[in-house]
Amino acid sequence: MPKAKTHSGASKRFRRTGTGKIVRQKANRRHLMEHKPTKRTRRLAGRTQVSANDAPRINKMLNG
């Protein structure tokens, strides 16, 4: 059986931590930021953990 390929879209969007959790960037922070409150843009900064229901599917795409 050939080697499974990593889903390239998933590899760009998700990252696995050292403990095996999958994290992602939050949405709504790419452009058109000037009319969004600073409070909102601060809240959207950083990474957040993927929901438990989505994790197995993403893990499969990342060949985990």
From Swiss-Prot:
One of its GO terms (molecular function) is structural constituent of ribosome. GO terms for cellular component: cytosolic large ribosomal subunit. PROSITE patterns: RIBOSOMAL_L35. Coiled coil: none annotated. The keyword DNA damage does not apply. Keywords: Ribonucleoprotein, Ribosomal protein. Residues 1-20, 37-64 are annotated as: Disordered. GO terms for biological process: translation. SUPFAM superfamilies: L35p-like. The keyword Ubl conjugation does not apply. PANTHER family: 54S RIBOSOMAL PROTEIN BL35M, LARGE RIBOSOMAL SUBUNIT PROTEIN BL35M. Belongs to the bacterial ribosomal protein bL35 family. NCBIfam families: rpmI_bact. This is Large ribosomal subunit protein bL35. The lineage of its organism: Bacteria, Bacillati, Actinomycetota, Actinomycetes, Mycobacteriales. The gene is rpmI.
